[in-house]
Protein backbone atom coordinates (compact mmCIF):
# COMPACT_ATOMS: atom_id res chain seq x y z
CA UNK A 1 0.00 0.00 0.00
CA UNK A 2 1.51 3.33 -1.01
CA UNK A 3 0.64 6.95 -0.28
CA UNK A 4 -0.47 8.95 -3.32
CA UNK A 5 1.17 12.18 -4.51
CA UNK A 6 -0.19 15.58 -5.50
CA UNK A 7 0.08 14.55 -9.17
CA UNK A 8 -2.18 11.51 -8.60
CA UNK A 9 -4.63 13.53 -6.46
CA UNK A 10 -4.97 16.20 -9.19
CA UNK A 11 -5.50 13.58 -11.90
CA UNK A 12 -8.14 11.67 -9.91
CA UNK A 13 -9.99 14.84 -8.94
CA UNK A 14 -9.94 16.40 -12.40
CA UNK A 15 -10.58 13.26 -14.47
CA UNK A 16 -12.57 11.03 -12.07
CA UNK A 17 -14.39 13.55 -9.84
CA UNK A 18 -12.76 12.17 -6.67
CA UNK A 19 -12.98 15.57 -4.90
CA UNK A 20 -15.56 18.26 -5.70
CA UNK A 21 -15.04 21.19 -5.50
CA UNK A 22 -11.31 20.73 -6.02
CA UNK A 23 -8.39 23.11 -5.54
CA UNK A 24 -5.25 21.98 -7.45
CA UNK A 25 -2.86 24.11 -5.34
CA UNK A 26 -2.61 25.40 -1.76
CA UNK A 27 -4.78 28.42 -0.95
CA UNK A 28 -3.37 30.54 1.88
CA UNK A 29 -5.12 33.90 1.35
CA UNK A 30 -8.70 34.96 0.65
CA UNK A 31 -9.81 37.38 -2.11
CA UNK A 32 -9.04 40.32 0.24
CA UNK A 33 -5.48 39.03 0.79
CA UNK A 34 -6.32 38.01 4.39
CA UNK A 35 -4.52 34.92 5.76
CA UNK A 36 -6.49 31.67 5.86
CA UNK A 37 -5.88 28.28 7.41
CA UNK A 38 -4.61 26.71 4.17
CA UNK A 39 -6.60 24.27 2.05
CA UNK A 40 -6.19 22.43 -1.26
CA UNK A 41 -3.65 20.00 -2.67
CA UNK A 42 -0.43 19.42 -0.73
CA UNK A 43 2.55 17.19 -1.55
CA UNK A 44 0.93 13.94 -0.38
CA UNK A 45 -2.57 14.89 0.65
CA UNK A 46 -5.53 17.20 0.33
CA UNK A 47 -6.44 19.80 2.97
CA UNK A 48 -10.24 19.94 3.26
CA UNK A 49 -12.42 22.84 4.35
CA UNK A 50 -15.13 22.94 6.95
CA UNK A 51 -18.59 24.02 5.73
CA UNK A 52 -20.80 26.58 7.55
CA UNK A 53 -23.03 23.96 9.15
CA UNK A 54 -22.20 22.92 12.73
CA UNK A 55 -23.76 20.86 15.51
CA UNK A 56 -22.50 21.66 19.01
CA UNK A 57 -23.12 19.41 22.01
CA UNK A 58 -25.37 20.88 24.68
CA UNK A 59 -26.65 19.57 27.99
CA UNK A 60 -29.86 21.62 27.98
CA UNK A 61 -32.02 18.47 27.83
CA UNK A 62 -29.79 16.38 30.15
CA UNK A 63 -29.49 13.74 27.43
CA UNK A 64 -27.17 10.76 27.67
CA UNK A 65 -24.88 10.18 24.69
CA UNK A 66 -25.79 6.72 23.42
CA UNK A 67 -24.53 5.74 19.95
CA UNK A 68 -27.27 3.06 19.66
CA UNK A 69 -30.07 5.44 20.60
CA UNK A 70 -28.79 8.89 19.72
CA UNK A 71 -30.87 11.89 20.80
CA UNK A 72 -30.75 14.73 18.25
CA UNK A 73 -31.56 17.14 21.08
CA UNK A 74 -27.98 16.63 22.28
CA UNK A 75 -26.92 19.25 19.72
CA UNK A 76 -27.57 22.89 18.90
CA UNK A 77 -27.51 23.62 15.14
CA UNK A 78 -25.51 26.63 13.97
CA UNK A 79 -24.91 28.04 10.49
CA UNK A 80 -22.04 30.53 10.58
CA UNK A 81 -18.59 31.47 9.28
CA UNK A 82 -17.20 30.56 12.71
CA UNK A 83 -18.10 28.04 15.37
CA UNK A 84 -17.23 28.53 19.02
CA UNK A 85 -16.82 25.17 20.75
CA UNK A 86 -17.32 25.42 24.53
CA UNK A 87 -14.47 24.33 26.84
CA UNK A 88 -13.97 20.55 27.03
CA UNK A 89 -16.80 20.06 24.54
CA UNK A 90 -17.45 18.58 21.13
CA UNK A 91 -18.90 19.64 17.77
CA UNK A 92 -19.72 18.11 14.41
CA UNK A 93 -19.40 19.70 10.98
CA UNK A 94 -18.92 18.54 7.41
CA UNK A 95 -16.47 19.15 4.61
CA UNK A 96 -17.17 21.58 1.79
CA UNK A 97 -15.79 18.88 -0.49
CA UNK A 98 -17.72 15.82 -1.68
CA UNK A 99 -15.56 12.68 -2.03
CA UNK A 100 -15.77 9.63 -4.31
CA UNK A 101 -13.15 7.15 -3.13
CA UNK A 102 -11.81 4.69 -5.76
CA UNK A 103 -12.19 0.95 -5.11
CA UNK A 104 -8.44 0.45 -4.63
CA UNK A 105 -8.00 3.37 -2.19
CA UNK A 106 -8.36 3.89 1.57
CA UNK A 107 -8.34 7.51 2.79
CA UNK A 108 -7.18 8.55 6.25
CA UNK A 109 -7.84 11.97 7.77
CA UNK A 110 -5.49 13.80 10.13
CA UNK A 111 -5.92 17.14 11.86
CA UNK A 112 -4.00 20.24 10.80
CA UNK A 113 -1.22 21.40 13.11
CA UNK A 114 -2.71 24.93 13.28
CA UNK A 115 -5.71 23.55 15.18
CA UNK A 116 -3.89 20.75 17.03
CA UNK A 117 -1.51 23.29 18.58
CA UNK A 118 -4.56 25.10 19.96
CA UNK A 119 -5.94 21.96 21.62
CA UNK A 120 -8.55 21.32 18.92
CA UNK A 121 -8.54 17.70 17.82
CA UNK A 122 -10.16 16.57 14.55
CA UNK A 123 -11.30 12.96 14.31
CA UNK A 124 -12.61 11.27 11.17
CA UNK A 125 -12.83 7.54 10.59
CA UNK A 126 -11.24 6.23 7.35
CA UNK A 127 -13.00 6.79 4.03
CA UNK A 128 -13.35 3.26 2.73
CA UNK A 129 -13.07 2.01 -0.87
CA UNK A 130 -16.03 3.23 -2.99
CA UNK A 131 -17.47 5.37 -0.19
CA UNK A 132 -18.83 8.71 -1.33
CA UNK A 133 -20.29 11.76 0.36
CA UNK A 134 -19.50 14.82 2.42
CA UNK A 135 -17.21 13.88 5.30
CA UNK A 136 -18.65 14.43 8.77
CA UNK A 137 -15.94 16.01 10.91
CA UNK A 138 -15.70 15.54 14.68
CA UNK A 139 -14.00 18.24 16.76
CA UNK A 140 -12.93 18.00 20.39
CA UNK A 141 -11.98 21.14 22.28
CA UNK A 142 -9.55 19.75 24.84
CA UNK A 143 -8.88 23.13 26.44
CA UNK A 144 -10.56 24.87 29.42
CA UNK A 145 -11.29 27.82 27.08
CA UNK A 146 -13.76 28.35 24.21
CA UNK A 147 -12.21 27.42 20.84
CA UNK A 148 -12.95 28.85 17.39
CA UNK A 149 -13.30 26.86 14.14
CA UNK A 150 -13.38 28.74 10.81
CA UNK A 151 -15.74 27.71 8.01
CA UNK A 152 -14.45 27.66 4.42
CA UNK A 153 -10.86 27.32 5.59
CA UNK A 154 -8.57 24.32 5.99
CA UNK A 155 -9.44 22.00 8.88
CA UNK A 156 -7.90 18.57 8.19
CA UNK A 157 -5.74 16.68 5.70
CA UNK A 158 -6.82 13.62 3.72
CA UNK A 159 -4.13 11.07 2.85
CA UNK A 160 -4.82 8.57 0.06
CA UNK A 161 -3.38 5.05 0.19
CA UNK A 162 -3.68 2.73 -2.80
CA UNK A 163 -3.60 -1.01 -2.23
CA UNK A 164 -1.58 -3.46 -4.30
CA UNK A 165 -4.74 -5.53 -4.60
CA UNK A 166 -8.40 -4.56 -5.14
CA UNK A 167 -10.67 -5.47 -2.22
CA UNK A 168 -13.31 -8.19 -2.66
CA UNK A 169 -16.02 -6.12 -0.97
CA UNK A 170 -16.15 -2.32 -0.98
CA UNK A 171 -18.16 0.03 1.24
CA UNK A 172 -20.67 0.42 -1.59
CA UNK A 173 -20.93 -3.37 -2.05
CA UNK A 174 -21.78 -3.72 1.68
CA UNK A 175 -24.47 -1.05 1.43
CA UNK A 176 -22.68 1.08 4.04
CA UNK A 177 -25.04 3.19 6.16
CA UNK A 178 -23.18 6.46 5.51
CA UNK A 179 -22.97 6.01 1.73
CA UNK A 180 -23.89 9.21 -0.15
CA UNK A 181 -24.26 11.30 3.01
CA UNK A 182 -24.75 15.03 2.64
CA UNK A 183 -24.81 17.51 5.47
CA UNK A 184 -23.68 16.76 9.01
CA UNK A 185 -24.69 13.13 9.60
CA UNK A 186 -25.46 11.89 13.11
CA UNK A 187 -24.63 8.35 14.34
CA UNK A 188 -26.58 5.44 12.82
CA UNK A 189 -26.75 1.80 13.88
Curated annotation (Swiss-Prot):
InterPro entries given in the database record: dCTP_deaminase (IPR011962), dUTPase-like_sf (IPR036157), dUTPase_trimeric (IPR033704)
Keyword Lipid biosynthesis: no
Gene Ontology MF term list: dCTP deaminase activity; nucleotide binding
Similarity comment: family membership: Belongs to the dCTP deaminase family.
Pfam annotation, one family: DCD
Catalysed reactions listed for this entry: dCTP + H2O + H(+) = dUTP + NH4(+)
PANTHER family assigned to the protein according to its UniProt record, in alphabetical order: DCTP DEAMINASE
Biological-process GO terms, alphabetical: dUMP biosynthetic process; dUTP biosynthetic process; nucleobase-containing small molecule interconversion
EC number: 3.5.4.13
Organism: Teredinibacter turnerae (strain ATCC 39867 / T7901)
Biological role stated in the UniProt entry: Catalyzes the deamination of dCTP to dUTP.
Protein name, entry field: dCTP deaminase
Keyword tags: Hydrolase, Nucleotide metabolism, Nucleotide-binding
Positions of dCTP binding: 112-117, 136-138, 157, 171, 181
Gene (name only): dcd
Subunit description: Homotrimer.
Active site (catalytic residues): 138 (proton donor/acceptor)
Record carries keyword Nucleotide-binding: yes
NCBIfam families listed in its UniProt record: dCTP_deam (TIGR02274)
Pathway: Pyrimidine metabolism; dUMP biosynthesis; dUMP from dCTP (dUTP route): step 1/2
